[in-house]
């Protein structure tokens, strides 16, 4: 079994990772780590996430010098569920020792240092690893994931958007010059576990944010190979993303061509479900699935994608990448 370490295990995505690793037949949960100065250090994991009382009672260890030494000498792989700038600093240390790293932050998703200064607010000093990282969109980049030491797990909105749009783009069905319009809503857990006024119980609402400046817009455009118009919303529920996407098709594109594009793209991909009816958050919350459906009228197409932002949009996609990297069946430990 592979000794698996999670850094950033106190957060929502880190907690989902811990549960998935615990249940994976080929992985051993070797350590749950938080920053050395974290107020959660030495607490039991289950005290923060009580659904795991009796099943995951391991302590959250501080990532101090002793912790780093233990990881570098005994771990087989590292999962980072840390802040973007923290991942940018930590990942090269693990990579230099030959450890495979699966990073859930945005630190290595786009091969452009200026992107990080503009959208993430920090200077990226790891150009080497930016160039070598594989973008872990599991259904689309399996060969790159197999070959890479560093896998940048996609963001939640990009996962939903790209799974919906890439079949159309690959098949050349989108009208030339058209920017797909992505209207997406995410549950409050997408904002993370840290307390904030706008995500507190009495303040949370359904509202748009990040208009024209959300960091996931350039990530989507970069990996789609086409500019998009992206408007995210904060939803008044806990988990899940629903993305409704509007596309103008090239002249003469038929419903059969659209259907075939999706069927071809996701044949043999068990975690993408072509539902035949418009997806819902209820259908995917707590699951690793991506549900897709579409409807065409003339040359206009509406595509709807639903995922769990903490699973397919984070932890379970990381697990898919682990399965791909180490030659396990793609859905091992997930379904």
Curated annotation (Swiss-Prot):
The active site is at 156. Disulfide bonds: none annotated. It catalyses: N-acetyl-L-glutamate 5-semialdehyde + phosphate + NADP(+) = N-acetyl-L-glutamyl 5-phosphate + NADPH + H(+). Its main location: cytoplasm. One of its GO terms (biological process) is L-arginine biosynthetic process. It comes from the Bacteria. Keywords: Amino-acid biosynthesis, Arginine biosynthesis, Cytoplasm, NADP, Oxidoreductase. The keyword Cytoplasm applies. One of its GO terms (cellular component) is cytoplasm. It holds the Pfam family Semialdhyde_dhC_1. Pathway: Amino-acid biosynthesis; L-arginine biosynthesis; N(2)-acetyl-L-ornithine from L-glutamate: step 3/4. It is found in: Cytoplasm. The keyword tRNA processing does not apply. InterPro entries: AGPR_AS, AGPR_type-1, NAD(P)-bd_dom_sf, NAGSA_dehydrogenase, Semialdehyde_DH_NAD-bd. GO terms for molecular function: N-acetyl-gamma-glutamyl-phosphate reductase activity; NAD binding; NADP+ binding. Its EC number is 1.2.1.38. Catalyzes the NADPH-dependent reduction of N-acetyl-5-glutamyl phosphate to yield N-acetyl-L-glutamate 5-semialdehyde. Belongs to the NAGSA dehydrogenase family. Type 1 subfamily. This is N-acetyl-gamma-glutamyl-phosphate reductase. It comes from Aeromonas hydrophila subsp. hydrophila (strain ATCC 7966 / DSM 30187 / BCRC 13018 / CCUG 14551 / JCM 1027 / KCTC 2358 / NCIMB 9240 / NCTC 8049).
């Amino acid at each position: 079994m592979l000794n698996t370490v999670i850094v950033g295990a106190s957060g929502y995505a880190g907690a989902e990772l811990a549960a998935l690793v615990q249940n994976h037949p080929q992985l051993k949960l070797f350590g749950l780590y938080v920053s050395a100065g974290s107020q959660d250090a030495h607490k039991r994991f289950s005290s923060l996430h009580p659904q795991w009382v009796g099943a995951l009672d391991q302590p959250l260890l501080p990532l101090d010098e002793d912790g780093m030494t233990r990881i570098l000498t005994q771990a087989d792989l590292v999962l980072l569920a840390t802040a973007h700038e923290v991942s940018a600093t930590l990942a090269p240390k693990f990579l230099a020792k030959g450890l495979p790293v699966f990073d859930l932050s945005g630190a290595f998703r786009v091969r452009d240092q200026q992107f990080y200064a503009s959208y993430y607010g920090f200077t990226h000093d790891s150009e080497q690893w930016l160039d070598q990282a594989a973008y872990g969109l599991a259904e689309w980049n399996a060969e790159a994931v197999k070959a890479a030491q560093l896998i940048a797990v996609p963001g939640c909105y990009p996962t939903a958007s790209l799974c919906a749009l890439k079949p159309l783009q690959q098949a050349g069905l989108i009208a030339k010059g058209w920017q797909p319009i992505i209207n997406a809503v995410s549950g409050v857990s997408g904002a993370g576990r840290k307390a904030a006024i706008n995500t507190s119980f009495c303040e949370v609402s359904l509202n748009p944010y990040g208009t024209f400046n959300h960091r996931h817009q350039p990530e989507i455009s970069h990996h789609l190979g086409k500019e998009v118009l992206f408007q995210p919303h904060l939803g008044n529920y806990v988990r899940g993303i629903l993305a409704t996407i509007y596309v103008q098709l090239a002249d003469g594109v038929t419903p059969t061509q659209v259907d075939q594009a999706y069927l071809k793209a996701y044949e043999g991909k068990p975690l993408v479900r072509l539902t035949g009816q418009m997806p819902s958050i209820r259908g995917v919350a707590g699951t690793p699935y991506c549900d897709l459906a579409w409807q065409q009228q003339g040359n206009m197409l509406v595509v709807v994608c639903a995922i769990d932002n903490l699973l397919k949009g984070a932890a379970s996609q990381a697990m898919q990448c682990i399965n791909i990297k180490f030659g396990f069946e793609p859905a091992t430990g997930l379904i």
